[in-house]
């Protein structure tokens, strides 16, 4: 075995700016989200109210309608996965864990009894849920999948504007909850505010305020400070002032009982009536607010047009508009309104929604609160309404009301109306829906929580039905719960959701990008047909959060993005990016994470600005960034500074050297095409890199990294053993490990990826080598010395070559084929299964009737091809026979066949063959069977397993005892209590051998309350508690493992339903580069191989060195990706000097530095040299740009695309041949091709094309027969598509007859 060369090439770093912080783990997005949801490593008592815990708490308690039963939730736990990740992939199973919840069922005989009669506590199985691997993926039915994060509209309030055709602006405010009805307030052309609930019918906003409790006009007007008390007098000047105004409250003449209603326009007669009634002052409506002169006529217009005048009338209006029928009574209407907005089970703003409303309306809410303080009568009414809302919440929900109320309150509604008034007056701005403050990310944990909510709601419904149908006979929680309810919802999410994707595993970068992707599509998101330009465009808030470069090129452009390198997602789902704090021009080392909302209105500067020796901004004024603008500001005004030049882009874009010299469109292609690069036979890191290569390789988990300081103990081709240094005070590895700190790393060997590329690891270390934390122990098929290596450094010349590199085609040297430079390995998987059919069971066998011995030479006794066999198309991979026969055989026939072995008559050959166009070497075979073939009998195997695990448990106990003695012997204890509060060991007890022996007993350990500690020393306590927790965990793991091993023996191999045996064959193919393969650089410079030339025909330099690849120079200027020329020149200098370069984006090598290194290497500074034609030996007329460029071979290989058909499958209805390689289809002969044949007058060929070669069923059979017998071809018949047309016309009720009489 050859160990890979681990001596790294010296590297020259061009970075001008050192980043103050390192980027976070690039898979953190997936791993943190899932583990925060599942909280499996958190002790029960420390679990936060989030994720699964929160969902389960909200789903319980469940009661029946009679109030006799109460089912409460206590806690949940998981078992270990039954199979490893590799076993699940091989067997086509799901890598999952079983979820168990502890429930308590209480019951009583009569509902009015104060206490519960009896309670039963029980652990109930709730189904199996897929578990995330340490690479951030899920294994679902044997396929590795990724759940992509979704970018959707954040709950909260959004203000927008529209322009009516008459030019008037109309404003709207939409309150979007996490769950419940959408409510929209909208102004119209008549200057009124309407309310739309769930986009249904509308009613005036005053009706809603009235229905909530502000019953009188005066109350509503008072809320907006629109009531004015005016003196009434007989003086003409005062009378004129009153004329035309509207009354704010009713005027009652006590003597006559006459009423002048509110909203009445004041006339001379009304003034006389008011004076006659003895009123000195009267309350009228005013249109502007006195302090600020704000026009609030919209409220007055709305009130004047409101048909309701009392709370009851308003409730009826709201009910009728929403339910489209009359309310049975007022109480029903009121409870309907309360259920819609104040019941937390029906209407939930969520933490995010409440936070967004408070943040957006903070000024309006503060102003409202201050105003109510000045108006005691309104404050009293408002407080009474608030109390009623709180009462409603507690009626519908048993949960205590937290700090923030997650339902809508009247304060929110009034604040929204106030903000709308500000918008009308031009005193506020509408929201930008594409701003990242209004869009949040739903990562995997939140999406799973939503599925659990659906599943538990269904389960709750079933439980209630069961409880209601039960009499008071004794039942246990397990009788009520159906595990399928929840697990089926979760399984269908992983299998069918648009956001659960088959992982792109072409190379480690593709894998990682897939996990860091953010999609605006999916359930509850946008659809690509409806998404406009604005939502797809780059927004200024994307800076440092979403990559402006990496996005797909097709219909999904802009809808699918990638997280930037430093971006993180906070607990509310908003994307944050780090900034250094700047105070009065002084750049500090304090780093803060800012969301788009936090950054709004702040002034930030790039990391490239000049600082003096004291870290102050050197210039007096600098160009900064604020919102979408780039003003020149004073250094003292700057708030924040970027942390790194890489901050703006994603990992894939950060791998493109000289990105700053490339056009954005080409950089996009470069970032996308790196993900399609096929791992090559021998990986080679780029000479010109950006410094991100190692980060991507580590964070994608492609390489194996040392976890701490230690010594390599053993290295083979497929395993590395490292003995880590044990430090009892600060242990990086488990103290309870049976191997005393030795960790074994199994290397992946020739594993097939999802895209059929080959994943294989090779060791980089040797026996006895000392390693430290973070050292790379093993490389992957796409890494070189721990750096991402997707392609090869090849000698390039930019020149035309006899037209063969026209239109981006590429001319290659034959050397690249001979030396396997661009050769890749592809592993294909084939599977065949045995099922139990109605006519009997199928069988794997090499005994196949009517097949020559030569065809069976590579099959073993089970009929499976041997490892190492070279196979080509049509070779048998798995021999299989399947029963045939029109009728089921009688018992007598079965007996006779069993005796005489007459197999030929009743079985047919169903063997699996190598498909067309495939050849390769069998590298692995697997046979799984439900009927396990065991050498020893089951009982003996069980006993052996018990013995093995007893030894492991005894070893674990002795290790635990040893470390406990080391930590505790002779120390004084604190008061050790049980989890029920009972004192187990009094305070001050000296811990001796006897007490330590007690600790070894599991019942004693299980009952201890660890939160109080064991001894007084903090560090010792921490170590002991960690040791006890780990001991408990390891014992449980051993117990689970024991059960799993026994289960496997009893059951045999677990296979998908209906399959008795499963055979898998893996074939490895070596694919050399050939004409038609697609290649690309990292700058979006892609092309297809147009010609492979003999080495002697390639252009060569003065010293006779032929170039490896010739690219067309016309592919550079119009594409504006000059980065490839910088890379070419610097790569050549690096090759000559034997060094590598690290040129990070936006702070890398300059033109002068590239020239400097070219000259240092003895090369011309402009990078151009004389070249000679390999065919004639003559010098080319001009000098040519030559150098080393990093080229990738992409997964668009001609072998997978080339396809031809003679006969094959036909479409069922039209009887025309199918299309596409996957269906073994034909080439479409379209209308333009028909024109071409018409133009040549090729009538017979045309007739053949449209009939016998297409869908004339009878004609094609006759033609085939004629060809076989060597006869003349018959006349074509009627095409089937004509019959289809006739049937369709008949389906429309038209009678069509074919008149085939010749006139």
Curated annotation (Swiss-Prot):
PROSITE patterns: RNA_POL_BETA. It catalyses: RNA(n) + a ribonucleoside 5'-triphosphate = RNA(n+1) + diphosphate. It comes from Chlorobaculum tepidum (strain ATCC 49652 / DSM 12025 / NBRC 103806 / TLS) (Chlorobium tepidum). Disulfide bonds: none annotated. CDD domains: RNA_pol_B_RPB2 (cd00653). This is DNA-directed RNA polymerase subunit beta. GO terms for molecular function: DNA binding; DNA-directed RNA polymerase activity; ribonucleoside binding. One of its GO terms (biological process) is DNA-templated transcription. The keyword Lipoprotein does not apply. DNA-dependent RNA polymerase catalyzes the transcription of DNA into RNA using the four ribonucleoside triphosphates as substrates. Belongs to the RNA polymerase beta chain family. Keywords: DNA-directed RNA polymerase, Nucleotidyltransferase, Transcription, Transferase. PANTHER family: DNA-DIRECTED RNA POLYMERASE I SUBUNIT 2. The RNAP catalytic core consists of 2 alpha, 1 beta, 1 beta' and 1 omega subunit. When a sigma factor is associated with the core the holoenzyme is formed, which can initiate transcription. One of its GO terms (cellular component) is DNA-directed RNA polymerase complex. Pfam families: RNA_pol_Rpb2_1, RNA_pol_Rpb2_2, RNA_pol_Rpb2_3, RNA_pol_Rpb2_45, RNA_pol_Rpb2_6, RNA_pol_Rpb2_7. Its EC number is 2.7.7.6. It is an enzyme of class 2 (transferase).
